[in-house]
Swiss-Prot record:
Enzyme class: hydrolase
Amino acids binding Zn(2+): H139, H143, E222
Membrane topology (UniProt): Multi-pass membrane protein
Gene Ontology cellular component list: plasma membrane
Signal sequence region: none
Top-rank taxon, per record: Bacteria
Cofactor(s), names only, from the UniProt record: Zn(2+)
HAMAP family: Pept_M48_protease_HtpX
GO MF term (any one): metalloendopeptidase activity
Cystine pairings recorded for this chain: none
Source lineage: Bacteria, Pseudomonadati, Pseudomonadota, Gammaproteobacteria, Enterobacterales
The protein's name in its UniProt record: Protease HtpX
Active-site residues per Swiss-Prot or TrEMBL entry: E140
Family, as annotated: Belongs to the peptidase M48B family.
């Protein structure tokens, strides 16, 4: 299943827009309780907007096409495989889509376990054996069965809430200190332009730091999805699929999609900001059975 970074762009846009609304409406003058309520509404708002739009955004991002009726043997195999594994995992049949990309990749998304989407790249269908492709699909089905999208939404909502709240409290203090005189006994928030500028910068900075939390969860859920695939189709098939990914093209999907894909980009400033664990760690975890217990 795909999931973090697609949220990040939408969350960022929603938070900036809501932040502007807060500034224009003077919400920074309200009580701490009022600000917390607004932060909760707006913080979770971005996450739930992302969740509800996730299938549409994902398909649009990669140019995916939902298979309404299989047109050839390859599409028929794909639909049948997804249907079989969905039944094994106890979820409703997801929509199935294909998108054109040379790299070996797949993702799953959707607002609910029973209203989900599984999409695979043409590169996966062309370059993986049936057993390897089956394991990748099982990995995505496991993401859906585990409810990773909803869990990610809740985590992102909490993170957004604290980012908004703390940023605006500090911005209010900074604006009051830098922006102006106030008469004794009269509440003042200083220069509103300073307030908005400081709040926006702090939201961006804290948002980047908070992404460490969401990225950790993204990596953690990959191990569990690998284990779920091993339970559905066998450990050796999943190991073989991951080994195949090591020799594949660097993923071409947009950065905002990486958390949803089975194959994440390997180049990163730090593992803290990676959506996926290194492939060698995932293979080792399967071999030791660490997440299969």
């Amino acid at each position: 299943m795909m999931r973090i970074a697609l949220f990040l762009l939408t969350n960022l846009a929603v938070m900036v827009v809501f932040g502007l609304v807060l500034s224009l409406t003077g919400i920074q003058s309200s009580s701490v309780q009022g600000l917390m309520i607004m932060a909760l509404l707006f913080g979770f708002g971005g996450s739930f907007v992302s969740l509800l739009m996730s299938k549409w955004m994902a398909l649009r991002s990669v140019g995916g096409e939902v298979i309404e009726q299989p047109r050839n043997e390859r599409e028929r195999w794909l639909v049948n495989t997804v249907a079989t594994q969905a039944c094994q995992a106890g979820i409703a049949m997801p929509q199935v889509a294909i998108y054109h990309a040379p790299d070996i990749n797949a993702f799953a998304t959707g607002a609910r376990r029973d209203a989900s989407l599984v999409a695979v790249s043409t590169g996966l269908l062309q370059n993986m054996s049936p057993d390897e492709a089956e394991a990748v699909i099982a990995h995505e089905i496991s993401h859906i069965a585990n409810g990773d999208m909803v869990t990610m939404t809740l985590i992102q909502g909490v993170v957004n809430t604290f980012v908004i709240f703390i940023s605006r409290i500090l911005a209010q203090l900074a604006a009051g200190f830098m922006g102006g005189n106030r008469d004794e006994g009269e509440e003042s928030n200083g220069n509103p332009l300073i307030y908005f500028a400081v709040a926006t910068v702090l939201e961006l900075v804290f948002g980047i730091l908070a992404s460490i939390i969401t990225m950790w969860f993204s990596r953690h859920r990959e191990f569990h999805a690998d284990a779920g695939s091993a339970k559905l189709v066998g450990r050796e098939k999943m190991i073989a699929a991951l080994q195949r990914l090591k020799t594949s093209y660097e993923p071409q999907e947009a950065t905002s999609m990486m958390a949803f894909c089975i194959n994440g980009k390997s180049k990163s400033l730090s593992e803290l900001f990676m959506t996926h664990p290194p492939l060698d760690k995932r293979i080792e975890a399967l071999r030791t059975g660490e997440y299969l217990k």
